[in-house]
């Protein structure tokens, strides 16, 4: 009986050891699987962005339209969406008379008068897809990184979008965010920008972008960043390199 008991104990030890090995293997591979999934997701996002209409980098600055109102983003969104405008919803945004009236007949008269104007704005947005948008530099740039000779930038982080207070229903987001996490300018300009940043002075990041598509799920105009400049004391300082 002692020999039988010893044999059973030996088998139990072997099985226990095998079980521990099998349990630890998946735990060790879990981070690897997560990393692979993350890389695959990023590759998919890049591929999707590459499949969209692309900007012509040679387009002159004079062809870019300054975005100063959320109504512009609304018209751009409608132009890119291919969906007929909801005239009543647009009128509610752009006309105080329409929004403030309780008279059904008067509202209809105002709406009928606005429809041609709305159509004209949407058609104009179809032909003007190059956009220029200014972002407050304070908070968008981190302190100058000496080891990288560049400003770490947060204005184009994945998931970031922008909207205007006069019409916050429509937003602007960028499709090639990963290429603009570090902004390089010449050394003299970097000193001036860092002095403004650290001294809480006003400066702006000027984004030149190309409207590519409308995201119907989020009311966003998706745009490709073409180039970036930093505006300080009324002068645009071109970003020499971004990555």
Question: For the regions a protein language model found, what residue spans apply to each?
Answer:
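Detector for methionine-enriched segments
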Residues: 1, 27-28, 74, 146, ...
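Sec-dependent bacterial lipoprotein signal peptides
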Residues: 1-16
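Residue-level marker of positions within ordered structural domains that often coincide
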Residues: 8, 23, 112
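Bacterial signal peptide processing site
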Residues: 18-22
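Extracellular/mature segments of secreted proteins
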Residues: 25-26, 185
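N-terminal Sec/ER secretory leader and immediately downstream segment
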Residues: 28-127
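Mature extracytoplasmic/lumenal regions of exported proteins
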Residues: 124-243
